Amino acid sequence: MTTKVEHAYIEKVQGIQGGRPVIKGTRTPVKSIVIYHRMGFTPEEIQIKLPHLNLAQIYDALSYYYDFKDEIDLDIDTDSEEKIKQELNLSFL
C-alpha cells in the first residue's frame, strides 16, 4: 500500500522559477537545496547559507527531492547543460 506524502513547505507556482518546485513563500527552488546537499552540506549548514529558510523547510525540500528524484535530477542536469552551452557560446565571441 502506497501512502501519498504531503510536502507542507513546497509549492509550484506559475511565474516563479518556471513553475518548478520552490520553498513555499520564497523563490528558493528545491534544486538549490539539493545542490548544496550534493556538495556535502548538512541541513544545518544549508540554513547558514540560506538563512531565510528554517530547518523544517530544508528537510521538506530534501524529502520532496527523494519523492521526485527523477524530476529534480533532470532539472539540475538540464540547467547544467544550458549553462555549459552559454559559456561555450560566450567563449567564441
Regions found by a protein language model. Give the residues of each.
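Intrinsically disordered, low-complexity and often Lys/Arg-enriched segments
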Residues: M1-V5, S91-L93
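Long, charge-rich, low-complexity alpha-helical segments
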Residues: P29-L93
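Short, Lys/Arg-enriched N-terminal segment that forms or immediately precedes the first helix
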Residues: H7-V22
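A generic structural signal for short, solvent-exposed coil/turn residues
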Residues: T2-K4, G15, Q47
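Anion-recognition interface
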Residues: G25
